[in-house]
């Protein structure tokens, strides 16, 4: 992701002497370890979920669905014990102030080489792609949740609710939920991380396009499971 990004390409060209020594070519450390430590923290965090909910009504619904699949909210939308774990470990930004603090920090870092207007516009592209990726992701989650709701999939004993649980990771009990996990933790992540790192090729072909394919396959698997159930 980094080596094919605009920053990564500049660094490699600088390294092989194509670009002069004094030219800007940010590395991972430049943007993510600004204070010289390993606290690699961003506004959106590792999973690109946060609170409060957005003003965009559709996006708010989609994010709520994803938070339900992460077990942070129950199927009725109420907070669970997992939210307390997230709070205790500070895994995500849970207030607008906390999110804005990290965004401001990143803007200051970008401003070392870019204008603030350019930096903000690029970061907003990342925000926008998260919204679009969440649209696909939430549709897939609801597809699998419907299988549980209609009794097509039996609730596993290890599940707190009859609802897909993304935190089972690769130990998900069904093929369709394994597909859902990969869609979330691999392809959705590539989509937004590739965008934030100015690597559109990575974001599109290894992220977004894979998410679209995942959703198509999940729809087909869901239809097959329903047909067998009936």
Which residues are covered by each model-predicted region?
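Primarily the internal scaffold of c-type cytochrome electron-transfer domains
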Residues: 1-229
């Amino acid at each position: 992701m980094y080596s094919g990004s605009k920053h990564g390409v500049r660094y490699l060209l600088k390294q092989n002497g194509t670009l002069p020594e004094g030219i800007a070519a940010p590395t991972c450390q430049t943007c993510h370890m600004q204070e010289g430590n390993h606290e690699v923290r961003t506004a959106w965090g590792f999973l690109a979920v946060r609170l409060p909910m957005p003003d965009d009504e559709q996006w708010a619904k989609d994010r709520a669905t994803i938070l339900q699949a992460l077990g942070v909210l129950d199927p009725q939308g109420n907070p669970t014990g997992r939210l307390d774990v997230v709070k205790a470990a500070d895994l995500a930004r849970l207030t607008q102030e906390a999110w804005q603090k990290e965004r401001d920090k990143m803007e200051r870092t970008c401003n070392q080489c870019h204008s603030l207007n350019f930096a903000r516009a690029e970061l907003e592209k990342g925000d926008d792609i998260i919204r679009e990726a969440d649209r696909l992701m939430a549709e897939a989650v609801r597809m699998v949740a419907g299988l549980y709701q209609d009794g097509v999939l039996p609730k596993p004993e290890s599940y707190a609710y009859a609802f897909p649980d993304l935190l089972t990771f690769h130990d998900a009990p069904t093929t369709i939920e394994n597909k859902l996990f990969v869609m979330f933790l691999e392809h959705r992540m590539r989509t937004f991380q590739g965008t934030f790192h100015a690597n559109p090729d990575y974001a599109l072909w290894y992220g977004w396009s894979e998410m679209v394919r995942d959703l198509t396959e999940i729809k087909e698997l869901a239809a097959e499971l329903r047909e067998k159930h009936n």
